[in-house]
Amino acid sequence: YTNQGPFQNAIKIEKLENNQVRVHYAVTRPAMQEKGMVFELASSAVRETAGAFTWEGKNVRAEKVNVHFMHGFGWLIQMSENVYYKDCNLMPRENSGHLTVSYADGIHASGASGEIVIENCNFANTHDDPINLHGTFTRVEKRIDSHTLELKYIHNQQGGFPQYHVGDKVQFFTRDLLSSTDGEKQYEVAEVISNPGENGNDLRTMKIKFKEDLPENLSDKIGGQPKYVAENVTYAPKVTIRNCTFRNVPTRGILCTTRKEVIIENNVFHNMSMATIFLSNDSNDWYESGPIRDMKIRNNTFYIKDIGRTSWEYAPAIYIHPVTKGGQFPDASNPIHKNISIEGNTFYMDEDTVVKAESVENLTFKNNKVFRMNPDVTVGIALDNKTIQAGQSVQLKTDAKG
């Protein structure tokens, strides 16, 4: 994956014979270019449509479906219950000359309930994450009265659909620490006064009334912006991702944040360009929500290799990195994520890190095999600012052979 496309720093393009062009550069051609590399040119990078759109659906199943090209997003899920994908292939057609299956994510859930099951599927050549499953934070713009809030989608690629329904349960978190200030109390939606696009609202703004009295501090600001975000915890699915393969992806393999049980098992990941499994919870950039409470990553195989990444500082096999306003995390007594088990996996490491984790309680790394595919890769564990060498122990221990 590289941002150094053929037109970076180009000053002139000259048309030649036999479908050839000569590109003139200001200084030198991009360093990442090598003979045999293939570049694709897209006339539009706008994600203006989805290959398949499931909205407020229930018990949706896709089996034995082959997808070879989707113009924008892939399969998009919003506010739906129980969605299943089995024996599906999201890959370019072999020997077709085409190298892209979608210009964005493969399977993307922005709010789901019940369960999402993805098994025996193959993903390749998506221009974004093959699987991205999350809720959506709406920002608390205004506490209208003791029961009513004005909420808003913030990211410019979110909006235009209802986020809340009567009876849904909602929790509030601070944007600076992703912490609850009321013991993660849940508030029940009593009335949807107006959805995005209704009653004079723009496509991102909604007004919601709750049964319970709302805390006065929901009006607080931080850095001149609203301090709190709201998450619809009713739309947090149980997730199973099993027996899938991932390859030729310029971003991550799996993103998943939900408070329900998550099992990621028996999958094979071939050389993702960024973090292979990325676990976030984000109150400032994409507003993709979900504190993890029970996740098992087991019996998977990871191949981690340098393939020319230029956009991320870190690209470990598993990267647990919440995103807050200001970049700070709560103290160890109140972590953002809890109970993540990494067991029985095999890692083939050519570069980077097996696991990089921030703000997690009860992180278990057990019975995994790590193979060094590059003799320059070092083996060790870093805990806060203290690095533990192979064979040493503080609260953790690492041993290496070969």
What would you call each of these model-derived segments?
Residues 1-68, 77, 93-100, 124-237:
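Extracellular polysaccharide-degrading/modifying enzymes targeting complex plant/algal/animal polysaccharides
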Residues 44-45, 53-59, 66-69, 76-79, ...:
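Low-complexity, polar/charged sequence tracts that form flexible coils or short amphipathic helices
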Residues 48-51, 105-108, 156-158, 227-231, ...:
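Short, recurring structural edge motifs at helix starts
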Residues 49-51, 71-76, 93-105, 127-133, ...:
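Short glycine/acidic-rich loop motifs that flank beta-strands on beta-rich extracellular proteins
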Residues 57-61, 78-84, 114-117, 237-240, ...:
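Short "repeat-start/strand-capping" segments in structured domains, especially the N-termini
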Residues 78, 82-122, 284, 288-294, ...:
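Extended hydrophobic/aromatic segments used for targeting, binding, or gating
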Residues 357, 361-402:
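Leucine-rich solenoid repeat scaffolds
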